[in-house]
UniProtKB/Swiss-Prot annotation:
Belongs to the RecR family. Residues 81-176 form the Toprim domain. Pfam families: RecR_C, RecR_HhH, RecR_ZnF, Toprim_4. Disulfide bonds: none annotated. This is Recombination protein RecR. It comes from the Bacteria. GO terms for biological process: DNA recombination; DNA repair. It comes from Histophilus somni (strain 129Pt) (Haemophilus somnus).
């Protein structure tokens, strides 16, 4: 038990970060208080500003402080005819770093998981349906994670695209099965994009 309630509170809240356990949270808290109080204040300010000002792009649903993100506002992207569907906002910079894609995105904010109560509406597939109806796409690239849930989600979206006569492809499985897209190295992800395959019924 810590002697300071404020210190206990800080450690407890640092544990909300992914991969941070009690010991790591304790080290962070002591480091900020002992060696970098100004850094801690800057971190607190940045967190407060980000939490209050960053929302979702009205088109692709990634994070942005504007109504539309920079990618969706890019005329070259708007006229590309390509839409890449990903599970998380963090997947976009991973794909962008490959330099192999210059189209637009749609972020699901998850994947289908009926056992957890996550259906099509919970991951924004009603919004994706509207985009497929009202925007012109030559090809939809499905870049969901190569997990059971990711594959099920990709198949569901493929059916939606077939209804609109839109070509559908799935990124190649150079990515390890069960892996997360944002943790894959750039070379592997680049080859996966180049070697994507069309889905056919």
């Amino acid at each position: 038990m810590q002697s300071s309630p404020l210190l206990e509170n800080l450690i407890e809240h640092l544990r909300c970060l992914p991969g941070v356990g009690p010991k790591s949270a304790q080290r962070m808290a002591y480091h900020l208080l002992q060696r970098d109080r100004s850094g801690g204040m800057n971190l607190a300010g940045a967190l407060t500003e980000a939490m209050s000002k960053i929302g979702h792009c009205t088109h692709c649903r990634t994070f942005t402080e504007e109504e539309s993100c920079a990618i969706c506002n890019n005329p070259r992207r708007q006229n590309s005819g390509f839409l890449c569907v990903v599970e998380q906002p963090s997947d976009i910079p991973a794909i962008e770093q490959t330099g192999q894609f210059s189209g637009r995105y749609f972020v699901l904010m998850g994947h289908l998981s009926p056992l957890d109560g996550i259906g099509p509406k919970e991951i924004g597939l009603d919004l994706l349906q509207k985009r497929l109806q009202h925007e012109s796409f030559y090809e939809v690239i499905l870049a969901t994670n190569p997990t059971v849930e990711g594959e099920a989600t990709a198949n569901y979206i493929a059916e939606m695209c077939f209804q609109h006569n839109i070509k559908v492809s799935r990124i190649a499985h150079g990515i390890p099965i069960g892996g997360e897209l944002e943790t894959v190295d750039g070379t592997t992800l680049s080859h996966s994009l180049i070697g994507r395959r069309e889905i056919q019924l």
